[in-house]
Amino acid sequence: MREIVHLQTGQCGNQIGAAFWQTISGEHGLDGSGVYNGTSDLQLERTNVYFNEASGNKYVPRAVLVDLEPGTMDAVRAGPFGQLFRPDNFVFGQSGAGNNWAKGHYTEGAELVDQVLDVVRREAEGCDCLQGFQITHSLGGGTGAGMGTLLISKIREEFPDRMMATFSVVPSPKVSDTVVEPYNATLSVHQLVENSDETFCIDNEALYEICMRTLKLSNPSYGDLNHLVSAVMSGVTTCLRFPGQLNSDLRKLAVNMVPFPRLHFFMVGFAPLTSRGAHSFRAVTVPELTQQMYDPKNMMAASDFRNGRYLTCSAIFRGKVSMKEVEDQMRNVQNKNSAYFVEWIPNNVQTALCSIPPRGLKMSSTFVGNSTSIQELFKRVGDQFTAMFRRKAFLHWYTGEGMDEMEFTEAESNMNDLVHEYQQYQDASISEGEEDYEEEPQVENEE
């Protein structure tokens, strides 16, 4: 059955990954050591999407954990679900990439990459019918960004026809973790545009906002943020793991969501998000889910879809929901917000239904949107990149690892092209093609 191999690279990737495994182990009724003690047969029916069954009724995640320093791995191993993972699947170096993309991509990471690929190969060989890969990483650091993109391109070479989904934490506008973030992110996007099939953009600041505004947490920890991300990750793949009337998988999602191959950067959202105290005061209904799902405050990337237009979007509902109600609500939303959808893709909302809700909820929905407003995010990083690159600040760290300035220039122009492509489709209208022909003869007459 359609298996997925999961990779997590770098500190951020490993922490999000750990939260993700915690979430789906819970959904499938597995405890911290991979032993099943759930209640429903449906939980076990398709555990093999993410888990291998070992001897003694133990389920082992099909996960490869990669980092260039042992610290984060030790933390995962010592965590509540540390005994879940196969010990051979921890692949780590000793040196660390020190937030340097070049170290992750060309020097330190390149030394470790074959070891990782061996593990990936072994996991892929154990699959009946491999659906694809998912990788969690950040774009601002060294290992997740540099080595993560290296792994993606290597896996792409070896498994060209399998889906490659990435959950990428993009640098946030106000909260910067490292000074060289714009460099690392631009170099990474340059790779992702070419090698990934779908990239779910997540950003820490938007997650902070959701935690403070919606969940009413006064000082959210990274644990809270990662929990939000894992809810979305679980939602995106829920159709693979549980039966439903209208299923979708990574490939169907990509076919429905990516109108042009380079434009595969998605915004994600999740509903219902309610603060811990307010849980008991609200009934979760389909209209409310749809409402909250399309709320700009609910998006996990810091770009406001009202500044752009949706090319396509997809909604995945979980729980006991009536098909008709969902269809009506989605149509309703599209009519209300018709200004924010491009009119040259009719019916651009895809819906999927899955009958099993996440733990502790009656129903929930996951939103994935391909909006042209994501260009704000790239534009912002691009501007910061240009400001630093013009002065050649911090460049010696990268050239010292054998990188060339040309690569930076290429990455910069690729990023700018991406922004322009989004802009072009945002401005496009249905009748454009016809108008062009009418105007051309007039131009000649004027001359």
UniProtKB/Swiss-Prot annotation:
Principal location listed in the UniProt entry: cytoplasm
Entry superkingdom: Eukaryota
Keyword Cytoplasm: yes
Cellular localisation: Cytoplasm, Cytoskeleton
Residues reported to bind GTP: Q11, E69, S138, G142, T143, G144, N204, N226
Stored InterPro entries: Beta-tubulin_BS, Beta_tubulin, Tub_FtsZ_C, Tubulin, Tubulin/FtsZ-like_C, Tubulin/FtsZ_2-layer-sand-dom, Tubulin/FtsZ_GTPase_sf, Tubulin_C
Ranges annotated as biased composition (Acidic residues): 432-447
Keyword GTP-binding: yes
SUPFAM superfamilies: Tubulin C-terminal domain-like (SSF55307), Tubulin nucleotide-binding domain-like (SSF52490)
Cellular-component GO terms for this entry: cytoplasm; microtubule
GO biological process, one term: microtubule-based process
Residue ranges, annotated region (Disordered): 424-447
Cofactor: Mg(2+)
Binding site for Mg(2+): E69
Keywords: Cytoplasm, Cytoskeleton, GTP-binding, Magnesium, Metal-binding, Microtubule, Nucleotide-binding
Family membership: Belongs to the tubulin family.
Function: Tubulin is the major constituent of microtubules, a cylinder consisting of laterally associated linear protofilaments composed of alpha- and beta-tubulin heterodimers. Microtubules grow by the addition of GTP-tubulin dimers to the microtubule end, where a stabilizing cap forms. Below the cap, tubulin dimers are in GDP-bound state, owing to GTPase activity of alpha-tubulin.
Oligomeric form and interacting partners: Dimer of alpha and beta chains. A typical microtubule is a hollow water-filled tube with an outer diameter of 25 nm and an inner diameter of 15 nM. Alpha-beta heterodimers associate head-to-tail to form protofilaments running lengthwise along the microtubule wall with the beta-tubulin subunit facing the microtubule plus end conferring a structural polarity. Microtubules usually have 13 protofilaments but different protofilament numbers can be found in some organisms and specialized cells.
Protein's UniProt name: Tubulin beta chain
Organism ancestry: Eukaryota, Fungi, Dikarya, Ascomycota, Pezizomycotina
